[in-house]
Amino acid sequence: MDLPIYFISDVHLMQTESSEEEAKRESLYRFLNFVRTTRGTLFFVGDLFDFYFEYPDVIPKSYFGFYNKAFQLKKAGVDLRFIAGNHDYWVLDFMKEKIMNHTYFDDTSFSLRGKNFYITHGDGVLSWDYGYRLLKKIIRSPFFIWCFRLLHPTLAYKIARKVSRTENHPELPQEV
């Protein structure tokens, strides 16, 4: 793992076009350009996307700008590491192989210069959050994923926009 190491979490890139979303993406891209100049390692610690569900032959075109920037970083030698969050758990080979260097579906840890690091997105860690932990088991189950993948991508993403908490609360901070 190369130094410096950067961490970014909960960006929640949206599929919708708005001035707020454009400003958020511009801010993210400035950060990614900075990381590119320093090389190193960049961890995306969950919820990079407000919703991401990859199909074997279909990727969401609304994230093209991010894919392009991330691919440029990877080609420039930046080690890109993606930890799946509760909004973007369902990645396949495009994100795992073409965009990122490493993908983690659970928490990860590493040691560096005698220090131990434990990296987690943090969803479902509250001891009393039984309902969410049950939901997490269901939506990450192979059966659920298989069933959801039967939906046409346009319909799947439309459903996701309806149930997204971030999409329904535009007053939440969107700064990167």
Task: Identify the function of each model-found stretch.
Residues 7, 116-120, 127:
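Short hydrophobic-aromatic micro-motifs
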Residues 73, 100-116, 142-154, 175-176:
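Short flexible/disordered coil segments
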Residues 2-4, 8, 13-112:
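Core catalytic region of metal-dependent phosphoesterases/phosphodiesterases
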Residues 122-176:
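Active-site-proximal loop/helix segment associated with metal-binding centers of metalloenzymes
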